[in-house]
């Protein structure tokens, strides 16, 4: 099965950041979240990225957890003023350094891409957000915003390349 077959089988739709998604769960319980207002407790989606596509830098007002399901390992780039660029490999445990789960703290700029040769042509992950995802809390990065995150420090070539790739 290839990525396009999975997109069709799971009923995935194009996501504004890149890739494809479908919400699979939205908690019916709600609460007032600090600074966010009324939100459900949690949400979950399927997210598929095909080889050659990118999930562009974006951030959420809630924590997000990525759970690897199948396909190629995927590199998630996280960018903060405090830590600069950090790269995380999410995938199956059979290849060594990849981990099957990654927590992305709220308000962290992040994006993702399949690097190197692709054995499957896609990555399928689940993303759980708490408090629950709401497009009002989703911010797609403009290049000047991302560059401002690292403007207070020397920017190495790797960071430059990732910023250019994911904006």
What residues fall within each predicted segment?
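Non-catalytic, conserved peripheral segments adjacent to functional cores
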Residues: 1-102, 111-112, 118-120, 131, ...
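Histidine-centered phosphotransfer motif of kinases
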Residues: 105
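Short edge-strand/loop segments of extracellular domains
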Residues: 128-135
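Short, well-structured beta-strand segments enriched in hydrophobic/aromatic residues
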Residues: 123-126
